[in-house]
Amino acid sequence: MSNIYIQEPPTNGKVLLKTTAGDIDIELWSKEAPKACRNFIQLCLEAYYDNTIFHRVVPGFIVQGGDPTGTGSGGESIYGAPFKDEFHSRLRFNRRGLVAMANAGSHDNGSQFFFTLGRADELNNKHTIFGKVTGDTVYNMLRLSEVDIDDDERPHNPHKIKSCEVLFNPFDDIIPREIKRLKKEKPEEEVKKLKPKGTKNFSLLSFGEEAEEEEEEVNRVSQSMKGKSKSSHDLLKDDPHLSSVPVVESEKGDAPDLVDDGEDESAEHDEYIDGDEKNLMRERIAKKLKKDTSANVKSAGEGEVEKKSVSRSEELRKEARQLKRELLAAKQKKVENAAKQAEKRSEEEEAPPDGAVAEYRREKQKYEALRKQQSKKGTSREDQTLALLNQFKSKLTQAIAETPENDIPETEVEDDEGWMSHVLQFEDKSRKVKDASMQDSDTFEIYDPRNPVNKRRREESKKLMREKKERR
């Protein structure tokens, strides 16, 4: 166990949780997990965890809390959004008493946290470890798991955090926020689930059969009387002082269809109304109903007519807008054409200031006329291009054939066709390789060891060297 403590980095920060199971001291790794520690300390300073329950208990694994709603799906961080995970190579889920952030996925940390009750290697690199339980308070932490739980890992009587106290805050710049505490819709007694009722074992009693029969009869009577208000007639059927005849009999007869506000006052006079008067009243009511229905039908028809008229008016407005746009476009086009024509006229009417401008304008008109003669893109345009190419080829071959090779005229700047008959000639600057024995400025020095001259020279030099050695 000591090697585990040696591997873990030193802590920097301490918080005390006061729970219904006892006090729990938590030391924080604020350098290794700064975001998680800052979030936890600030929520403790803001009393965010006060009166929150430990809503999830997995025996031998974890105890989870920190959700103000108590459902396991609530809680927010101080950053206003889930913050990222912070993993460290020296912090592993290898023992009990570690405090880590609970999340629903990667980088989804909020306010919920959990204590480990044992080794949990499957949680490594999935949850951020930011603290550990120290001292004897680890036994109070273990008491949090000693509760009855249901199939959803929710305790029947969960422990809760009464208050939090920050003993050492490594973050001096934390400013607690003012959080409005939500009012609980139900009192705490109603939120807590009741313990399951025990079943009665009548076989242990000497009068068990009689007690069981009485219990069944009571249950049957309570089920039959459940949800119904009973009078003394229902409960005391054998009482001779109670009459079984109702006090007031309901009068059978046709009641009028419409009743006015003064119904109670006119009830006494209804008995004296003759049959003819009743028939007249019914006819009046029927006529009135017919008028109402016809008025409703008429109003519905008028509404449909109004809708049709509105839709027709909208269509007319759209058509008017479209026509207006077309007129504006035509007008703008007309103005542009008029401006172009005026510009052309002004160019024609203006006298050329000098010969160069006049020549430029003539050339421009010439090429514009040629451009107008050109056909549009397509097969005809391609045919025209091929015809021009063939014409140029024939012209080039004709110019070469007419000009003899010896009599090549010099090209002139103004002659556009002189270059067609010109022949390109280059100066021969190649150097000749001659014999190595001949000394010439234009020859290259070539050394070939197989050359007989070079062989003789080598033999003579060897002979001279031998003679020198002998003389010594």
Curated annotation (Swiss-Prot):
CDD domains reported in the protein's UniProt record: CWC27_CTD, cyclophilin_CeCYP16-like
GO BP annotation list: mRNA splicing, via spliceosome; protein folding
Record's subunit section: Part of the activated spliceosome B/catalytic step 1 spliceosome, one of the forms of the spliceosome which has a well-formed active site but still cannot catalyze the branching reaction and is composed at least of 52 proteins, the U2, U5 and U6 snRNAs and the pre-mRNA. Recruited during early steps of activated spliceosome B maturation, it is probably one of the first proteins released from this complex as he matures to the spliceosome C complex. Component of the minor spliceosome, which splices U12-type introns.
Coiled-coil segments: 206-230, 306-377
Record keywords, A-Z: Acetylation, Coiled coil, Disease variant, Dwarfism, Glycoprotein, Intellectual disability, Nucleus, Phosphoprotein, Retinitis pigmentosa
Localisation per UniProt entry: Nucleus
Residues the record lists as Phosphoserine modifications: 346
GO terms under cellular component: catalytic step 2 spliceosome; nucleoplasm; U2-type precatalytic spliceosome
Modified residues (N-acetylserine): 2
Record-given protein name: Spliceosome-associated protein CWC27 homolog
Disease linkage: Retinitis pigmentosa with or without skeletal anomalies: An autosomal recessive disease characterized by retinal degeneration, brachydactyly, short stature, craniofacial dysmorphism, and neurologic defects. Retinal defects are consistent with retinitis pigmentosa in most patients. Neurologic manifestations include mild-to-moderate intellectual disability and psychomotor retardation.
Glycosylation sites: 109, 201
Protein function: As part of the spliceosome, plays a role in pre-mRNA splicing. Probable inactive PPIase with no peptidyl-prolyl cis-trans isomerase activity. As a component of the minor spliceosome, involved in the splicing of U12-type introns in pre-mRNAs.
Main location as per UniProt: nucleus
Pfam families xref list: Pro_isomerase
